Amino acid sequence: MGFVEGEVEIQQPGGSWRKASEDQSLAIGDRVRTLPGSTARLEFPWTAIAVGDGSEVALQNQRVLTLRLEIGRIDIDPEQTLLQVVTAEATVSGSGRTLVRREGGATFVGSYNGGANVEAKGAIVRLGVNKGTVVKTDGPPAEPLAMGPAPKIIAPGADPRYVKVAEAVRLKWKGPETAYHLEVLSIDSDVPVVSIDISALEYELRLPWLGTFRWRVAGRTGPVESEPSGEGLICVVEK
């Protein structure tokens, strides 16, 4: 567990759910879940995975390192090539920054860099840059389609907003969807420290860490997400 923000729990085989902590080791068979408004980061020697809020994942005992997504959303670092993700509907492998979201008996896979492979019912599709596919129960992957148009951020934008630790900053954007996914990332990482679903066009964010952060949003309709927006900047200072 490389990072824990909010309420994150871990369950070992045969055990009960208990509070997770940063730097806690994970073993095959362990399960991790995030409560609403919370984010976790799973770190491996060659990659990292952001687990969005309201999600549950499990490390499976397979020949290839396998992470099972039961529900919710994960965002896989671009450097990954040795990890596969499975859901009840699909198997995801390959390379490049990839998001996998499962809800309502369907799995959506989006590839930001290209290179993700999605397999179901004996059929395989390879996703290009900013392409996505949906896999429904007992069906093959749908033909890859371009991810929808990105929302537009309003504030803060390219000019950084300076705030103190835990001071509120209101994020605003516009787009046609009624639901969105918000990500906040440190300036030097592609793995989010905040990864949450929102049903609004603004959000009051409080960051407990010093440093410079980027934020972006993607529209969502069910499990399907749009391209992410451009990025705004937030600088958290001591005073």
PLM region descriptions:
Residues 161-165:
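Short, solvent-exposed loop/linker segments at the N-terminal edge
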Residues 193-199:
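Short beta-strand segments within Ig-like beta-sandwich modules, predominantly Fibronectin type-III
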Residues 224-236:
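Extracellular fibronectin type III
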Residues 167-177:
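Conserved aromatic anchor
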Residues 204-212:
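Surface-exposed, short loops/turns at beta-strand junctions within beta-sandwich domains
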Residues 9, 181-185:
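Beta-strand signatures of extracellular beta-sandwich domains
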Residues 1-159:
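Flexible, surface-exposed loop/linker segments and immediately adjacent secondary-structure boundaries
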